[in-house]
């Protein structure tokens, strides 16, 4: 198994030990500690309390037990670009969790998706809401993979940096009738919503900071992100700004000391604005990108304001 998977189960730099599924301690004769029969799952973040941490462990044990009873023998699904599109969005992952829990129940393991709700809310918090007469528009944090940059020489050593200048949000309509004939516009570009898990969802990827090195150093910072709701006559009915970082200055004074302080910082980065008295505006239609079916990438939108 070690010889079969060692060149496949690595991180993006080829490191076996830092892979999300690490087998360098399973049956590795090249290391004095490599014959322990261990498989490490390294992609789990530490939960804030014992209950959620135990729940994550229970979920993993349930999946392992299911696979022991019913090994998967079919062909693997080639997800392609969907891994960095659909499955970066909370709605896509929540729907996928539902399918896994359905498979668990099918083999006699009664694991309910709602048990994972608290972990889901920790990982994908609601950043803000826009209230409308028919309901609300919900904005959540989404996942954003940060690419590894080329080698950089400095001080006699070579290192590779990560481009952390981009961020991704999910904008969801829990009720398909919330907008009526209106639309949601981000930085002047109209969003295209897709049905997912019983709601309409769109991802938004944007340049959040001026990091270096970066894949797109020429793209200006697109924070604060301006989110607007227009009616059928393209009149502004609701809007808010979301700041990626401290809206009052260049940086925060250290990490938050308490959970309440962290929540207060997040709340302050969502700024609803008055929407009355604005003249009609015409949003720019989003340009098509095959690898971003669910996500609007503002870096690639020439008409973005």
Predicted regions and their residues:
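C-terminal accessory/tail domains of diverse enzymes
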Residues: 1-305
């Amino acid at each position: 198994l070690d010889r079969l998977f060692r060149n496949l189960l690595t991180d993006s730099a080829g490191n076996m030990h830092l892979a999300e599924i690490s087998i360098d301690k399973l049956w590795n004769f090249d290391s004095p500690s490599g014959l322990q029969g261990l498989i490490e799952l390294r992609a789990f973040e530490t939960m804030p309390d014992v209950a959620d941490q135990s729940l994550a462990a229970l979920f993993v044990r349930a999946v392992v037990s299911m696979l022991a009873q019913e090994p998967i023998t079919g062909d693997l699904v080639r997800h392609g670009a969907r891994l960095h599109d659909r499955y970066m969005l909370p709605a896509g992952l929540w729907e996928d969790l539902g399918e896994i829990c359905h498979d668990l129940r099918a083999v006699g393991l009664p694991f309910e998706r709602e048990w994972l709700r608290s972990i889901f809310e920790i990982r994908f918090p609601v950043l803000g809401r826009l209230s409308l007469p028919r309901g609300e528009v919900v904005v959540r944090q989404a996942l954003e993979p940060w690419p590894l940059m080329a080698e950089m020489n400095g001080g006699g050593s070579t290192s590779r940096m990560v481009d952390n200048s981009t961020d991704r949000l999910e904008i969801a309509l829990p009720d398909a009738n919330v907008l009526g004939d209106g639309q949601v516009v981000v930085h002047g570009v109209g969003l295209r919503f897709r049905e997912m898990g019983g709601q309409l969802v769109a991802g938004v990827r944007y340049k959040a900071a001026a990091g270096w090195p970066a894949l797109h150093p020429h793209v200006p910072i697109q924070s604060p992100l301006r989110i607007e709701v227009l009616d059928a006559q393209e009149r502004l009915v609701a809007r808010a700004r979301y700041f990626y970082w401290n809206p009052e200055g260049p940086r925060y004074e250290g990490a938050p000391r308490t959970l309440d302080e962290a929540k207060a910082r997040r709340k302050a980065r969502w700024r609803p604005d008055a929407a009355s008295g604005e003249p009609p505006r015409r949003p720019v239609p989003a340009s098509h990108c095959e690898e971003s079916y669910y996500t609007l990438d503002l870096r690639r939108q020439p008409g973005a304001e």
